[in-house]
A protein has these predicted regions:
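Conserved motor-coupling elements within RecA-like helicase/translocase cores
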Residues: 89-97, 101-125, 136-139
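Hydrophobic residues in beta-strands of the RecA-like P-loop NTPase core, especially within AAA+ ATPase
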Residues: 127, 144-145
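Loop/turn-to-beta-strand initiation segments
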Residues: 70-73, 97, 120-124, 138-141, ...
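Short basic/glycine-enriched coil/helix segment immediately N-terminal to the Walker B
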Residues: 39, 133-140
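Pre-Walker A segment
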Residues: 1-77
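Post-Walker A helix-loop "phosphate-sensing" segment adjacent to the P-loop in P-loop NTPases
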Residues: 66-73, 95-97, 197-201
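Post-DEXD/H (motif II) to motif III coupling segment of the RecA-like Helicase ATP-binding lobe
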Residues: 56, 141, 148-204
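Short beta-strand-centered segment that lines the nucleotide-binding/catalytic pocket of NTP-utilizing
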Residues: 72-84, 103, 203-204
Length: 204
């Protein structure tokens, strides 16, 4: 009887990184510079830009920066199943360096991705609100895309929380930064920006 042990990677297979180059326009370059300056002084930056204004490109540039510094990045989306276009764009740009995490994983898949995040092997995690509970080793940045979306709030089952607000607290444990974005910022986030708690960057 021959017994063999075979290693199986259960994490969702992603395409290899493709050469996807893009040039930022003047407004994007200005906004990116404002984000960099903001992170020197504050933990949270809110990007207000209309749909198709180029917020995703700003997220990609910031992700690149933090990963190059050896940090891990968590990219939060309100609903994984409804954001296929953004996921595809990130996959094409980062390839196998990014992993998707969601509540439909079975136990074996959860354990595998959990361990790879805990050891720091995985650098970029894309997920819905439940991804906040992953055991990051060296978290540097949390991106909260469409921060106004009510899907970030969990009512039932417990625990009840807003992933957007929880992200700010979780980031503080790592001395990490939070980059929020929306075409229609939530009242709470806009208020925090007006009170100078967050930095507000407008992308036109």
């Amino acid at each position: 009887l021959l017994v063999q042990r075979r290693s199986t990677d259960r994490i969702q297979s992603l395409p290899k990184k493709m050469e996807v180059n893009f040039e930022l326009n003047y407004s994007q370059k200005r906004a990116l510079n404002e984000i960099d300056i903001s992170f020197e002084k504050k933990e949270v930056c809110l990007v207000h830009g209309v749909t198709s204004s180029g917020k995703t490109q700003l997220y990609i540039k910031q992700i690149e920066k933090f990963v190059s510094e050896g940090k891990q990045v968590l990219y939060l989306l309100p609903e994984i199943t409804l954001t296929a276009q953004i996921i595809r764009r990130l996959q094409l740009y980062f390839g196998g360096n990014i992993a998707i995490y969601h509540s439909k994983f079975n136990n074996n898949e959860r354990i595998e991705i959990w361990n790879k995040i805990k050891t720091g092997e995985l650098k970029i995690i894309l997920g819905a609100r439940s991804a906040l509970f992953l055991p990051f080793k060296n978290l540097g940045l949390i991106v909260v895309d469409e921060e106004h979306d009510p899907s970030f709030k969990q009512q039932d089952p417990a625990p009840r929380y807003n992933a957007r607000d929880a992200a700010v607290f979780y980031a503080s444990l790592f001395n990490a930064k939070v980059l929020m974005g929306s075409a229609t910022p939530s009242l709470e986030s806009y208020y925090n920006a007006q009170k100078n708690k967050y930095t507000l960057v407008t992308l036109k």
